[in-house]
């Protein structure tokens, strides 16, 4: 029998942020719901680890930018890599507060001394250097939505336009990688990344949840090491 427990709740200008725990067949599962949209849960988090690995293919990275704190799994996966500094931008300030309070074990990952949490909109980081941390970064990880077809906030659609993707790409160091998590393959996103640089790749990850199989997708785009890596001009 399944039971639900609310761990934390906050209403922001963008809607309700709900963190809850459910017991399902003896398993404790934490889930995050934002603005009425199911953002994620803790039942299967292997793709967060894969996201960090694909974004950080090299042995060492000085700086990494993570867009979206969520339940902290992506940040924890990045922390497990050889990284000097991790900048995390989260639009819902309550999630940062819950992280400092250690409401869940994975949110405590943000207490890593290498990690700095910024309350703000990741779009502004790419659009205006006066907001939040300033690049460039060796890796940029976007884990703010379930992909461009399943947005938590409609305004996030700007991130996945040609202009938005180019803005993120421009803030990578030479050899740096942009990685984007999606709950399913998005051909339009793949095409948009290919228009920027030939290094764009689609990684399909098959995950079994219960009796169902899902094909999640991670998209990566890397800047050349031996040049300034300018985006292709149309």
PLM region descriptions:
Residues 14, 27-29, 61, 136, ...:
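A structure-centric signal for secondary-structure junctions around beta-strands
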Residues 176:
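Glycine-centered, small-residue-biased loops immediately flanking beta-strands
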